[in-house]
Amino acid sequence: MNHIQEAFLNTLKVERNFSEHTLKSYQDDLIQFNQFLEQEHLQLKTFEYRDARNYLSYLYSNHLKRTSVSRKISTLRTFYEYWMTLDENIINPFVQLVHPKKEKYLPQFFYEEEMEALFKTVEEDTSKNLRDRVILELLYATGIRVSELVNIKKQDIDFYANGVTVLGKGSKERFVPFGAYCRQSIENYLEHFKPIQSCNHDFLILNMKGEAITERGVRYVLNDIVKRTAGVSEIHPHKLRHTFATHLLNQGADLRTVQSLLGHVNLSTTGKYTHVSNQQLRKVYLNAHPRAKKENET
């Protein structure tokens, strides 16, 4: 990458508090763009709208999802906007490029009985289950991101207020409450999980060697739980986040509260969770519609 691109990434890190994960995505987008420039014998400074359209076609030819293409174009549009503030001769070739529409999807979630089955799998008090259960409890009870989970320190847990302070996107702190089951799980883990009693750091969630667990490690733990649970398949940390939001909304929580708990900046981001299960839809319909049931039906 050239010095302008490096300065751009540094600005995102210092002034806009972008996470390392987000910065890595921006960096990868710029590297791929540079490879295209080299392949087509194009220059960054003379890149124009026609070239931008060709680049869009190039991305689609690599069989990328529309969401990925949309993000890559957004990265380059933002980069050129930054460059324009430094050089008045620069023109943003991506400003008129129409964003590819993102695929619409309903977030996947677990039904309540599926969650109960997952918890039943880790209910026996073995050393591994103590750790696995606290991971499952925290993700489901709080809806936090896996990146937030792995960075929780022991001092972030507030047993007086029954909640945890996490560092979210943009380095923003938020407090998320948890319930009695999650509290008990954390207490049992801290008291009986041997690696945490002998480690020399403050991270809460550890691997079996006593080291701070990684995001990949969390995914491995969740996949292992699913393998041991009958009737449940396909799990990932964000699915538990979807489940957290869906179950709250299904039980009557308002959208603003869920937005705050999830740490979303925009309410529209939380809006995707307003879907409900078919079972819940039918329940609401049967109870609400005047002609949903005959008089002799219950």
From Swiss-Prot:
Subunit details: Forms a cyclic heterotetrameric complex composed of two molecules of XerC and two molecules of XerD.
InterPro entries: CB (IPR044068), DNA_brk_join_enz (IPR011010), Integrase-like_cat_sf (IPR013762), Integrase_catalytic (IPR002104), Integrase_recombinase_N (IPR010998), Integrase_SAM-like_N (IPR004107), Recomb_XerC (IPR011931), Tyrosine_recombinase_XerC/XerD (IPR023009)
Domain of life, per lineage: Bacteria
Protein name per its UniProtKB record: Tyrosine recombinase XerC
Species in which this protein is naturally found: Staphylococcus aureus (strain Mu3 / ATCC 700698)
Active site location: R145, K169, H238, R241, H264, Y273
Similarity comment text for this entry: Belongs to the 'phage' integrase family. XerC subfamily.
Predominant place of localization: cytoplasm
